[in-house]
Amino acid sequence: MRSYLLNQFLFSIIILKIIMVPSVLLADNNPINTDILEIKTLGKKWLELYRSSNIEKFMDLYTEDALVALNGKPALKGKEAIQAYFASRIGKKNVDMRLDYEKISIYQNTAIVVAKFYLDYPFEERIETVGGRSLIVYKKSDLGKWLIDVDIDQKTPDAN
């Protein structure tokens, strides 16, 4: 009888663990959920700083040796090259960007994001929209801040 009660007790503990683990993973204070929220917020911050023309703050979003590869353009390697490219392009308040996140994976201090992007900009008398897919790799700095390490944006037929 004692063995039976012990088995029932252990079985109950196992069942409780099975039930509790998913709720712990979904909890609002779960570090992964917090990181995902921070990363999604960075997409909005990028657009805000792009519109602001504050190139120094804009560049604070990138790692020192970041790589940016834009559709049909040579890769930009390092902050200096990225800044040189964006310096004359940012500050356009009438540009809008939307991200449709398809996948966000976090592995310790690295986050990988795949998203469809839509960039709206004025062209002559109308608004043009360019769509594509982004692969963005974020690295967490020593200060705990997520920074863009790799940003690859390409036009894709399913994002128009």
List the predicted regions and their residue ranges:
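Short beta-strand edge/turn micro-motifs at domain boundaries
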Residues: 131-159
